[in-house]
C-alpha cells in the first residue's frame, strides 16, 4: 500500500508477528471488543465502530463510521509523515478497515471512491464481498473532504 502503513486482522496478526517484523509504532483498533495489545512503546487508539449483521441500520452505521473518518485518516497521515509505522487492525470478515484504507487513498491519492475501491481490490483478496456496505460513507467523505479542495 504505502510505506509503513499496514493492515492485519485480529485473526492473523499474532501468527504473522506483524508488530515486531514491521516495527509497528501505532496500532489503530477498528472495532469495539478486542483488548489493546498493551506493549510498551506501542501507541494504541480505538475506532469504536462495529457492523452488527443481526441488528443494524445501514445508513446509521455509515454515518457512524464517517464521523471517525477525518480524524482517523489525519492521525494515520501524521504518523506516516513522521516515519512511524502504522497498523490498522480489525476483523477479517468486516469491511471497516478496508473503508479506512480507501479513505486514505481518496484523501492523499486524490481519487474518487470507486477508484480507491478498485485499487484496494488489486492489492487484497476478498475485499467488499459480496458488496461494499459503506459506499454512502465513502461518497460522503469524498464529497465533503476531498472534492471541495
Question: What residue spans do the PLM features occupy?
Answer:
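Cysteine-based protein phosphatase catalytic domain of the PTP/DSP
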Residues: 1-86, 103-141, 145
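Intrinsically disordered, low-complexity regulatory segments in eukaryotic proteins
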Residues: 148-149
Amino acid at each position: 500500500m504505502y510505506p509503513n502503513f499496514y493492515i492485519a486482522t485480529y485473526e492473523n496478526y499474532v501468527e504473522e508477528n506483524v508488530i515486531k517484523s514491521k516495527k509497528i509504532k501505532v496500532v489503530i483498533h477498528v472495532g469495539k471488543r478486542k483488548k489493546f495489545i498493551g506493549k510498551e512503546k506501542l501507541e494504541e487508539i480505538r475506532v469504536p465502530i462495529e457492523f452488527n449483521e443481526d441488528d443494524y441500520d445501514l445508513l446509521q452505521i455509515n454515518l457512524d463510521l464517517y464521523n471517525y473518518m477525518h480524524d482517523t485518516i489525519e492521525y494515520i497521515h501524521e504518523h506516516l509523515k513522521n516515519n512511524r509505522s502504522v497498523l490498522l487492525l480489525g476483523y477479517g470478515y468486516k469491511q471497516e478497515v478496508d473503508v479506512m484504507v480507501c479513505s486514505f487513498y481518496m484523501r492523499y491519492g486524490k481519487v474518487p471512491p470507486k477508484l480507491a475501491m478498485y485499487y484496494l481490490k488489486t492489492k487484497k483478496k476478498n475485499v467488499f464481498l459480496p458488496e461494499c456496505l459503506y459506499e454512502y460513507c465513502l461518497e460522503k467523505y469524498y464529497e465533503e473532504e476531498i472534492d471541495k479542495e
